[in-house]
Amino acid sequence: MIPYFVTDGIKVVTTGEQNAIYFQPTVWAHLTVGLGAPSYIFLEVFMKKVGIIMGSDSDLPIVKKATDMLKILDIPFEVHVYSAHRTPVEARDFAVNARDNGFGAILAFAGMAAHLAGAIAANTTLPVIGVPCKGGCVDGLDALLSTVQMPTGIPVATVAINGGANAALLAAQILAVSDADLAKKLDEKRVNDAKVVLEKDAGIMDRL
Protein backbone atom coordinates (compact mmCIF):
# COMPACT_ATOMS: atom_id res chain seq x y z
CA MET A 1 0.00 0.00 0.00
CA ILE A 2 1.24 3.51 -0.82
CA PRO A 3 1.80 5.56 2.35
CA TYR A 4 -0.27 8.71 2.59
CA PHE A 5 -2.25 10.81 4.99
CA VAL A 6 -5.23 13.09 4.49
CA THR A 7 -5.58 16.50 6.07
CA ASP A 8 -8.35 19.00 5.37
CA GLY A 9 -9.18 17.67 1.93
CA ILE A 10 -5.56 17.14 0.84
CA LYS A 11 -4.09 13.70 0.33
CA VAL A 12 -0.32 13.76 0.83
CA VAL A 13 1.30 10.77 -0.89
CA THR A 14 4.88 10.09 0.19
CA THR A 15 6.12 8.42 -2.97
CA GLY A 16 7.50 9.33 -6.37
CA GLU A 17 4.98 7.19 -8.21
CA GLN A 18 1.65 8.56 -9.37
CA ASN A 19 -0.27 5.36 -8.75
CA ALA A 20 -2.27 6.29 -5.66
CA ILE A 21 -6.03 6.01 -5.46
CA TYR A 22 -7.62 8.97 -7.24
CA PHE A 23 -10.54 11.05 -6.07
CA GLN A 24 -12.34 13.43 -8.41
CA PRO A 25 -11.61 16.22 -9.07
CA THR A 26 -7.84 15.95 -8.62
CA VAL A 27 -5.02 18.45 -8.69
CA TRP A 28 -1.44 17.19 -8.50
CA ALA A 29 1.53 19.33 -7.46
CA HIS A 30 5.21 18.42 -7.09
CA LEU A 31 7.05 19.79 -4.08
CA THR A 32 10.81 19.56 -3.57
CA VAL A 33 11.69 18.36 -0.08
CA GLY A 34 15.13 18.69 1.53
CA LEU A 35 18.41 20.20 0.38
CA GLY A 36 20.04 17.25 -1.41
CA ALA A 37 18.81 15.37 -4.46
CA PRO A 38 15.21 16.38 -5.12
CA SER A 39 12.53 14.14 -3.75
CA TYR A 40 8.84 14.65 -4.24
CA ILE A 41 5.49 14.34 -2.61
CA PHE A 42 2.20 14.69 -4.41
CA LEU A 43 -0.67 16.78 -3.15
CA GLU A 44 -4.05 15.54 -4.29
CA VAL A 45 -6.89 17.94 -3.57
CA PHE A 46 -10.32 16.34 -3.67
CA MET A 47 -13.83 17.63 -3.21
CA LYS A 48 -15.46 16.70 0.06
CA LYS A 49 -18.57 14.55 -0.10
CA VAL A 50 -22.08 15.33 1.05
CA GLY A 51 -23.56 12.72 3.34
CA ILE A 52 -27.28 12.07 2.91
CA ILE A 53 -29.19 10.24 5.63
CA MET A 54 -32.90 9.45 5.46
CA GLY A 55 -34.91 8.02 8.31
CA SER A 56 -36.97 5.86 5.97
CA ASP A 57 -36.89 4.98 2.29
CA SER A 58 -40.32 6.60 2.04
CA ASP A 59 -38.35 9.86 2.02
CA LEU A 60 -36.55 8.86 -1.19
CA PRO A 61 -38.55 11.14 -3.56
CA ILE A 62 -37.45 14.15 -1.49
CA VAL A 63 -33.89 12.85 -1.25
CA LYS A 64 -33.81 12.57 -5.04
CA LYS A 65 -34.38 16.32 -5.32
CA ALA A 66 -31.14 16.77 -3.41
CA THR A 67 -29.13 14.16 -5.30
CA ASP A 68 -30.29 15.57 -8.65
CA MET A 69 -28.98 18.99 -7.63
CA LEU A 70 -25.68 17.58 -6.39
CA LYS A 71 -25.24 15.77 -9.70
CA ILE A 72 -25.78 19.04 -11.58
CA LEU A 73 -22.99 20.60 -9.52
CA ASP A 74 -20.71 17.52 -9.78
CA ILE A 75 -20.58 17.11 -6.01
CA PRO A 76 -19.93 13.55 -4.77
CA PHE A 77 -22.39 12.16 -2.26
CA GLU A 78 -23.23 9.05 -0.30
CA VAL A 79 -26.75 7.98 0.75
CA HIS A 80 -27.83 5.84 3.70
CA VAL A 81 -31.07 4.85 5.44
CA TYR A 82 -30.50 5.26 9.18
CA SER A 83 -33.28 5.87 11.69
CA ALA A 84 -32.61 7.92 14.81
CA HIS A 85 -34.97 5.57 16.66
CA ARG A 86 -34.57 2.16 14.99
CA THR A 87 -30.84 2.24 14.16
CA PRO A 88 -29.35 4.76 16.60
CA VAL A 89 -25.97 3.03 16.77
CA GLU A 90 -25.44 3.12 13.00
CA ALA A 91 -26.60 6.74 12.79
CA ARG A 92 -24.21 7.75 15.55
CA ASP A 93 -21.28 5.85 14.01
CA PHE A 94 -21.84 7.56 10.68
CA ALA A 95 -21.83 10.99 12.31
CA VAL A 96 -18.81 10.34 14.51
CA ASN A 97 -16.70 9.14 11.56
CA ALA A 98 -18.05 11.50 8.89
CA ARG A 99 -15.20 14.00 8.94
CA ASP A 100 -12.52 11.32 8.72
CA ASN A 101 -14.46 9.67 5.89
CA GLY A 102 -14.23 12.77 3.69
CA PHE A 103 -17.61 14.41 4.26
CA GLY A 104 -17.98 18.18 4.37
CA ALA A 105 -21.69 18.46 5.17
CA ILE A 106 -24.57 16.14 6.04
CA LEU A 107 -28.21 16.28 4.96
CA ALA A 108 -30.74 14.56 7.23
CA PHE A 109 -34.23 13.78 5.91
CA ALA A 110 -37.02 12.75 8.29
CA GLY A 111 -40.74 13.19 8.86
CA MET A 112 -43.12 13.32 11.83
CA ALA A 113 -41.05 13.00 15.07
CA ALA A 114 -38.01 14.10 13.09
CA HIS A 115 -35.10 13.64 15.49
CA LEU A 116 -32.61 12.44 12.88
CA ALA A 117 -30.92 15.76 12.09
CA GLY A 118 -30.50 16.56 15.77
CA ALA A 119 -29.15 13.11 16.55
CA ILE A 120 -26.59 13.44 13.75
CA ALA A 121 -25.63 16.97 14.82
CA ALA A 122 -25.12 15.81 18.40
CA ASN A 123 -22.30 13.55 17.22
CA THR A 124 -20.40 15.74 14.74
CA THR A 125 -19.31 19.34 14.34
CA LEU A 126 -19.75 19.16 10.57
CA PRO A 127 -22.60 21.32 9.23
CA VAL A 128 -25.88 19.38 9.41
CA ILE A 129 -28.83 20.44 7.27
CA GLY A 130 -32.22 19.11 8.28
CA VAL A 131 -34.93 18.44 5.70
CA PRO A 132 -38.36 17.96 7.29
CA CYS A 133 -40.49 15.67 5.15
CA LYS A 134 -44.22 16.03 4.62
CA GLY A 135 -46.40 13.37 6.22
CA GLY A 136 -48.49 12.56 9.23
CA CYS A 137 -51.56 14.37 10.46
CA VAL A 138 -50.17 17.91 10.10
CA ASP A 139 -48.46 17.59 6.71
CA GLY A 140 -44.88 17.99 7.91
CA LEU A 141 -45.31 20.82 10.41
CA ASP A 142 -44.39 18.45 13.24
CA ALA A 143 -41.21 17.45 11.37
CA LEU A 144 -40.34 21.10 10.71
CA LEU A 145 -40.67 22.06 14.36
CA SER A 146 -38.82 18.94 15.53
CA THR A 147 -35.92 19.75 13.21
CA VAL A 148 -35.60 23.48 13.70
CA GLN A 149 -36.05 23.73 17.49
CA MET A 150 -32.58 22.65 18.54
CA PRO A 151 -30.96 23.53 21.87
CA THR A 152 -28.12 26.04 22.05
CA GLY A 153 -24.81 24.42 21.20
CA ILE A 154 -26.13 21.81 18.73
CA PRO A 155 -27.21 23.78 15.65
CA VAL A 156 -29.09 22.30 12.70
CA ALA A 157 -29.68 24.39 9.59
CA THR A 158 -33.25 23.66 8.51
CA VAL A 159 -34.82 24.18 5.08
CA ALA A 160 -38.48 24.15 4.09
CA ILE A 161 -40.68 21.07 4.27
CA ASN A 162 -39.63 18.76 1.39
CA GLY A 163 -36.85 21.24 0.55
CA GLY A 164 -34.39 18.71 -0.81
CA ALA A 165 -33.05 20.90 -3.62
CA ASN A 166 -32.38 23.87 -1.35
CA ALA A 167 -30.69 21.58 1.17
CA ALA A 168 -28.29 20.44 -1.55
CA LEU A 169 -27.64 24.03 -2.63
CA LEU A 170 -26.93 25.07 0.95
CA ALA A 171 -24.49 22.19 1.33
CA ALA A 172 -22.85 23.26 -1.93
CA GLN A 173 -22.49 26.83 -0.69
CA ILE A 174 -20.85 25.56 2.50
CA LEU A 175 -18.35 23.49 0.51
CA ALA A 176 -17.77 26.39 -1.90
CA VAL A 177 -16.29 28.53 0.88
CA SER A 178 -13.04 26.63 0.29
CA ASP A 179 -13.61 25.52 -3.31
CA ALA A 180 -13.31 28.23 -5.97
CA ASP A 181 -14.41 25.95 -8.82
CA LEU A 182 -17.61 25.03 -7.01
CA ALA A 183 -18.25 28.67 -6.15
CA LYS A 184 -18.00 29.49 -9.86
CA LYS A 185 -20.53 26.76 -10.69
CA LEU A 186 -22.94 28.19 -8.14
CA ASP A 187 -22.52 31.69 -9.57
CA GLU A 188 -23.19 30.37 -13.07
CA LYS A 189 -26.29 28.55 -11.86
CA ARG A 190 -27.66 31.77 -10.38
CA VAL A 191 -27.15 33.51 -13.72
CA ASN A 192 -28.84 30.68 -15.64
CA ASP A 193 -31.76 30.61 -13.19
CA ALA A 194 -32.27 34.33 -13.74
CA LYS A 195 -32.27 33.83 -17.52
CA VAL A 196 -35.06 31.25 -17.20
CA VAL A 197 -37.21 33.73 -15.27
CA LEU A 198 -36.55 36.53 -17.76
CA GLU A 199 -37.44 34.26 -20.68
CA LYS A 200 -40.77 33.56 -19.00
CA ASP A 201 -41.26 37.28 -18.44
CA ALA A 202 -40.61 38.00 -22.12
CA GLY A 203 -43.30 35.56 -23.20
CA ILE A 204 -45.93 36.03 -20.52
CA MET A 205 -48.12 38.45 -22.51
CA ASP A 206 -48.39 35.92 -25.33
CA ARG A 207 -49.96 33.45 -22.91
CA LEU A 208 -52.85 35.78 -21.99
Task: For each feature predicted by the language model, list its residue ranges.
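Glycine-rich phosphate-binding loop
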Residues: 94-132
